[in-house]
Protein backbone atom coordinates (compact mmCIF):
# COMPACT_ATOMS: atom_id res chain seq x y z
CA UNK A 1 0.00 0.00 0.00
CA UNK A 2 2.45 2.68 1.19
CA UNK A 3 5.16 0.95 -0.83
CA UNK A 4 3.29 1.80 -4.04
CA UNK A 5 2.75 5.42 -3.02
CA UNK A 6 6.44 5.87 -2.19
CA UNK A 7 7.63 4.56 -5.58
CA UNK A 8 8.97 7.95 -6.66
CA UNK A 9 11.14 8.10 -3.53
CA UNK A 10 14.18 6.09 -2.54
CA UNK A 11 14.39 5.38 1.19
CA UNK A 12 17.93 5.23 2.53
CA UNK A 13 18.26 3.56 5.93
CA UNK A 14 21.50 4.63 7.59
CA UNK A 15 21.59 1.91 10.22
CA UNK A 16 23.62 -1.22 10.71
CA UNK A 17 21.07 -2.50 13.23
CA UNK A 18 19.62 -5.82 12.08
CA UNK A 19 16.45 -5.04 14.05
CA UNK A 20 15.86 -1.70 12.28
CA UNK A 21 16.56 -3.29 8.91
CA UNK A 22 14.07 -6.06 9.67
CA UNK A 23 11.44 -3.51 10.73
CA UNK A 24 11.71 -1.74 7.36
CA UNK A 25 11.31 -5.10 5.60
CA UNK A 26 8.35 -5.96 7.84
CA UNK A 27 6.76 -2.57 7.03
CA UNK A 28 6.91 -3.72 3.39
CA UNK A 29 9.13 -0.80 2.38
CA UNK A 30 11.78 -0.82 -0.32
CA UNK A 31 14.98 0.67 1.04
CA UNK A 32 18.72 0.77 0.60
CA UNK A 33 21.26 0.63 3.40
CA UNK A 34 24.03 3.25 3.49
CA UNK A 35 26.37 3.42 6.43
CA UNK A 36 28.75 6.09 7.70
CA UNK A 37 31.03 5.97 10.70
CA UNK A 38 29.83 8.67 13.07
CA UNK A 39 31.37 9.24 16.48
CA UNK A 40 28.35 9.25 18.77
CA UNK A 41 29.43 11.96 21.18
CA UNK A 42 26.97 14.49 22.55
CA UNK A 43 27.30 17.54 24.82
CA UNK A 44 27.17 16.41 28.48
CA UNK A 45 24.43 18.87 29.41
CA UNK A 46 21.89 17.15 27.13
CA UNK A 47 19.20 15.02 28.79
CA UNK A 48 16.88 12.23 27.64
CA UNK A 49 15.28 13.01 24.25
CA UNK A 50 17.76 15.86 23.68
CA UNK A 51 20.47 13.19 23.42
CA UNK A 52 18.66 10.98 20.92
CA UNK A 53 17.54 13.98 18.84
CA UNK A 54 21.13 15.28 18.75
CA UNK A 55 22.58 11.90 17.73
CA UNK A 56 19.93 11.10 15.11
CA UNK A 57 20.50 14.52 13.53
CA UNK A 58 24.30 14.12 13.79
CA UNK A 59 24.06 10.83 11.88
CA UNK A 60 21.89 12.45 9.21
CA UNK A 61 24.25 15.40 8.83
CA UNK A 62 27.05 12.99 7.92
CA UNK A 63 25.26 12.65 4.56
CA UNK A 64 25.12 16.42 3.94
CA UNK A 65 25.30 17.19 0.21
CA UNK A 66 25.09 13.52 -0.81
CA UNK A 67 21.33 13.03 -1.14
CA UNK A 68 19.60 13.08 -4.50
CA UNK A 69 16.30 14.87 -5.02
CA UNK A 70 14.11 11.78 -4.59
CA UNK A 71 15.98 10.27 -1.62
CA UNK A 72 14.73 10.16 1.97
CA UNK A 73 17.43 9.39 4.50
CA UNK A 74 16.37 7.77 7.77
CA UNK A 75 18.67 7.81 10.80
CA UNK A 76 17.89 7.00 14.40
CA UNK A 77 19.28 6.66 17.88
CA UNK A 78 18.02 4.81 20.94
CA UNK A 79 19.01 5.15 24.58
CA UNK A 80 17.77 3.83 27.87
CA UNK A 81 17.12 6.71 30.30
CA UNK A 82 17.35 5.62 33.92
CA UNK A 83 17.98 7.52 37.14
CA UNK A 84 18.57 10.74 35.18
CA UNK A 85 21.31 9.12 33.12
CA UNK A 86 21.67 7.72 29.59
CA UNK A 87 22.53 4.06 29.26
CA UNK A 88 23.94 3.36 25.83
CA UNK A 89 25.62 0.18 24.60
CA UNK A 90 27.72 -1.52 27.28
CA UNK A 91 31.50 -1.51 26.92
CA UNK A 92 31.98 -4.99 28.42
CA UNK A 93 30.34 -7.64 30.61
CA UNK A 94 30.88 -5.71 33.83
CA UNK A 95 29.32 -2.58 32.33
CA UNK A 96 26.35 -4.65 31.07
CA UNK A 97 25.91 -6.21 34.51
CA UNK A 98 25.90 -2.80 36.25
CA UNK A 99 23.37 -1.40 33.76
CA UNK A 100 20.94 -4.29 34.13
CA UNK A 101 21.38 -4.51 37.90
CA UNK A 102 20.57 -0.79 38.25
CA UNK A 103 17.26 -1.34 36.41
CA UNK A 104 16.23 -4.36 38.49
CA UNK A 105 12.82 -3.88 40.15
CA UNK A 106 12.39 -0.39 38.64
CA UNK A 107 10.93 1.37 35.61
CA UNK A 108 13.12 3.00 32.98
CA UNK A 109 12.45 4.81 29.71
CA UNK A 110 13.57 3.75 26.26
CA UNK A 111 13.84 6.77 23.98
CA UNK A 112 14.28 6.62 20.22
CA UNK A 113 14.61 9.59 17.89
CA UNK A 114 14.27 9.23 14.14
CA UNK A 115 15.50 11.81 11.64
CA UNK A 116 14.09 11.98 8.12
CA UNK A 117 16.31 14.04 5.82
CA UNK A 118 16.00 15.04 2.19
CA UNK A 119 18.26 17.35 0.20
CA UNK A 120 16.04 20.28 1.23
CA UNK A 121 14.65 19.54 4.71
CA UNK A 122 14.70 17.36 7.77
CA UNK A 123 12.16 16.21 10.34
CA UNK A 124 12.81 14.76 13.78
CA UNK A 125 10.35 12.62 15.70
CA UNK A 126 10.76 10.61 18.87
CA UNK A 127 9.00 8.10 21.05
CA UNK A 128 9.30 7.17 24.72
CA UNK A 129 8.38 3.77 26.14
CA UNK A 130 8.37 2.92 29.85
CA UNK A 131 9.65 -0.56 30.72
CA UNK A 132 9.46 -2.20 34.15
CA UNK A 133 11.76 -5.02 35.23
CA UNK A 134 11.04 -7.48 38.00
CA UNK A 135 13.55 -8.00 40.81
CA UNK A 136 16.45 -9.75 39.06
CA UNK A 137 18.94 -12.15 40.58
CA UNK A 138 22.63 -11.71 39.84
CA UNK A 139 22.59 -15.26 38.49
CA UNK A 140 19.93 -14.47 35.85
CA UNK A 141 21.73 -11.27 34.79
CA UNK A 142 25.07 -13.09 34.44
CA UNK A 143 23.40 -15.94 32.52
CA UNK A 144 21.88 -13.46 30.07
CA UNK A 145 25.12 -11.56 29.50
CA UNK A 146 27.17 -14.74 29.06
CA UNK A 147 24.72 -16.42 26.67
CA UNK A 148 23.26 -13.49 24.72
CA UNK A 149 26.15 -10.97 24.72
CA UNK A 150 23.97 -7.83 24.55
CA UNK A 151 26.84 -5.46 23.70
CA UNK A 152 25.08 -3.97 20.67
CA UNK A 153 21.98 -2.93 22.62
CA UNK A 154 21.22 0.27 24.51
CA UNK A 155 20.79 -0.56 28.18
CA UNK A 156 22.43 -3.97 27.64
CA UNK A 157 19.25 -5.92 26.92
CA UNK A 158 17.00 -7.02 24.10
CA UNK A 159 13.31 -7.13 24.99
CA UNK A 160 12.77 -9.64 22.16
CA UNK A 161 15.21 -12.14 23.70
CA UNK A 162 15.04 -14.56 26.64
CA UNK A 163 15.79 -11.70 29.01
CA UNK A 164 12.79 -9.67 27.89
CA UNK A 165 10.46 -12.63 28.26
CA UNK A 166 11.83 -13.38 31.73
CA UNK A 167 12.45 -9.90 33.17
CA UNK A 168 9.92 -7.42 31.77
CA UNK A 169 6.72 -7.12 33.79
CA UNK A 170 5.23 -4.04 32.11
CA UNK A 171 5.59 -2.04 28.88
CA UNK A 172 3.87 1.32 28.47
CA UNK A 173 4.06 2.54 24.90
CA UNK A 174 5.53 1.17 21.69
CA UNK A 175 7.08 -2.28 22.01
CA UNK A 176 9.04 -1.84 18.77
CA UNK A 177 10.48 1.40 20.13
CA UNK A 178 12.23 -0.67 22.80
CA UNK A 179 13.81 -2.68 19.97
CA UNK A 180 15.08 0.51 18.32
CA UNK A 181 12.36 1.92 16.08
CA UNK A 182 8.84 3.26 16.78
CA UNK A 183 7.44 1.61 13.66
CA UNK A 184 3.91 3.02 13.86
CA UNK A 185 5.24 6.60 14.06
CA UNK A 186 7.72 5.99 11.23
CA UNK A 187 5.02 4.52 9.00
CA UNK A 188 2.60 7.33 9.84
CA UNK A 189 5.21 9.97 9.01
CA UNK A 190 6.06 8.35 5.68
CA UNK A 191 2.35 8.40 4.72
CA UNK A 192 2.40 12.20 5.09
CA UNK A 193 5.00 12.45 2.33
CA UNK A 194 2.72 11.06 -0.37
UniProtKB/Swiss-Prot annotation:
Pfam families: Maf (PF02545). GO terms for molecular function: dTTP diphosphatase activity; UTP diphosphatase activity. One of its GO terms (cellular component) is cytoplasm. It catalyses: dTTP + H2O = dTMP + diphosphate + H(+); UTP + H2O = UMP + diphosphate + H(+). Coiled coil: none annotated. Belongs to the Maf family. YhdE subfamily. Nucleoside triphosphate pyrophosphatase that hydrolyzes dTTP and UTP. May have a dual role in cell division arrest and in preventing the incorporation of modified nucleotides into cellular nucleic acids. One of its GO terms (biological process) is nucleotide metabolic process. It comes from Flavobacterium johnsoniae (strain ATCC 17061 / DSM 2064 / JCM 8514 / BCRC 14874 / CCUG 350202 / NBRC 14942 / NCIMB 11054 / UW101). Keywords: Cytoplasm, Hydrolase, Nucleotide metabolism. Its EC number is 3.6.1.9. InterPro entries: ITPase-like_fam, Maf-like. It is found in: Cytoplasm. Gene3D superfamilies: 3.90.950.10. This is dTTP/UTP pyrophosphatase. The keyword Cell membrane does not apply. Its cofactor is a divalent metal cation. PANTHER family: BIFUNCTIONAL DTTP/UTP PYROPHOSPHATASE/METHYLTRANSFERASE PROTEIN-RELATED, BIFUNCTIONAL DTTP_UTP PYROPHOSPHATASE_METHYLTRANSFERASE PROTEIN-RELATED. It is an enzyme of class 3 (hydrolase). The record marks 19, 78, 160 as: Important for substrate specificity. The active site is at residue 77. NCBIfam families: maf.
Amino acid sequence: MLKEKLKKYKIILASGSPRRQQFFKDLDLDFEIRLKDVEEIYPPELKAVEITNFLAELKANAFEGELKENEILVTSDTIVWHQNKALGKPKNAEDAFQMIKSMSNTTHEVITSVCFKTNTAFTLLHDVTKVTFKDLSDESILYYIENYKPYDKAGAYGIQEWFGFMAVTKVEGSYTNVMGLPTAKVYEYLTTLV
